[in-house]
A protein has these predicted regions:
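Secreted, periplasmic, or luminal enzymes acting at the cell surface/secretory milieu
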Residues: 1-137, 143-145, 151-153
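Intrinsically disordered, low-complexity Pro/Gly/Ser/Thr-rich segments with frequent PxxP/GP/PP motifs
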Residues: 140, 151-174
Length: 174
């Protein structure tokens, strides 16, 4: 985001000249330092053969696939289903704004959802109708849930509860 342009854009949104249609690109947690990704955060230095600190640093990534929304959605599912080591977890207290969250000055209705499979490829289609009083754009996000099979469990395969596989934004709808 180029700072000098934010003023005009923000003014257009606040005055209603433009209806906001963006979505959050990450999960906004109440305490970001409590996420698995933050547990390994730090400035770890490499040492040379004499034990002296070098100018090179590293980070150890141990959270696997459970970063961003995948962590929060999977932990929520584990809590609901009583599986794994999710423990006592309250999604509403942990997540302030979920991945893909957004506001608009109008409202939309989705209908006529279709999913067509051709081999391993799925094409999803939905009709989006503006039901509000002002023009705006909407974002449709498509998530899938993969079965967690006995093979996955036996072999330690990690799968998130849900995964974003596609999205699209409508044109301006009156």
């Amino acid at each position: 985001l180029y700072a000098p342009t934010i003023g005009a854009s923000m003014a257009d949104i606040l005055t209603g000249k433009v209806s906001p249609s963006g979505r959050t690109v990450d999960t906004f947690a109440a305490d970001a330092s409590a996420s698995p990704a933050a547990q390994n955060f730090g400035d770890y230095a490499y040492y040379d053969e004499n034990g002296n600190i070098t100018k090179y640093n590293y980070v150890t990534y141990e959270e696997g696939i459970y970063v961003g929304y995948r962590y929060y959605e999977t932990r929520y599912e584990d809590t609901v289903l009583g599986q794994g080591n999710a423990g006592d977890y309250d999604y509403a207290k942990e997540v302030i704004y979920p991945f893909g969250y957004g506001l608009s000055y109008t409202s939309f209705d989705w209908s006529d959802f279709k999913a067509d499979w051709s081999g391993d490829t799925c094409t999803a289609q939905v009709t989006v109708t503006n039901t509000g009083d002002v023009s705006g754009k909407d974002v449709v996000e498509v998530y899938v849930q993969s079965p967690y099979t006995d093979y996955d469990k036996t072999n330690g395969v990690e799968k998130p509860a849900v995964e974003l596989v596609g999205y699209g934004k409508t044109a301006e709808l009156a």
